[in-house]
Amino acid sequence: MMKLIVAVVHHTDGEEILRALTEAHYSVTRIASSGGFLRRRTATLLLGVQADQVAAARQLIREHSAPQVDAGFKRATVFVLNVERYEQV
């Protein structure tokens, strides 16, 4: 079953995470975004993966996010969604 990973990461981590994922042969779409109470700049990464690839992709995101400095400020938020249908045209 296909999964959609939506990873919202700090904008300064976005390029490093994108590089790591593409080097691991994941197809990734990066979207500039902002959010949260302070409207901080973020990067939203979209990945379509097989179910058995989710853990490895999440691990790459974790490994290539900068260390958390402030307990109230997370470096990444990752959503994993079921994909009912997937097609490329």
Model-derived features: positions:
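Positively charged, small/polar-rich N-terminal and surface patches that mediate targeting and assembly
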Residues: 1-89
